[in-house]
């Protein structure tokens, strides 16, 4: 799928299966471009989306 490469400033951190579920901060991604299974979170801790 084609995804824009822009950073979603609403995303504070993400957690991915490939990182062993560790929190990854300072991410520059968006809901479309995130790796499969990665969960993207807002700064208040709510989940914004999961990569598909």
From Swiss-Prot:
Supply the source organism for this entry: Capsicum annuum (Capsicum pepper)
Which family does the UniProt entry place this protein in?
Belongs to the protease inhibitor I20 (potato type II proteinase inhibitor) family.
Keyword Disulfide bond annotated: yes
Q: Which Gene3D superfamilies match?
A: 3.30.60.30
Return the protein name: Proteinase inhibitor PSI-1.2
Gene Ontology molecular function: any one: serine-type endopeptidase inhibitor activity
Described purpose of this protein according to its UniProt entry = Potent inhibitor of trypsin and a weaker inhibitor of chymotrypsin. It does not inhibit elastase and subtilisin DY.
List the InterPro entries hit by this protein, alphabetically.
Answer: Prot_inh_I20, Protease_inhibitor_I20
Annotated disulfide bonds: 3-32, 7-28, 16-38, 31-49
Q: Which UniProt keywords apply?
A: Disulfide bond, Protease inhibitor, Serine protease inhibitor
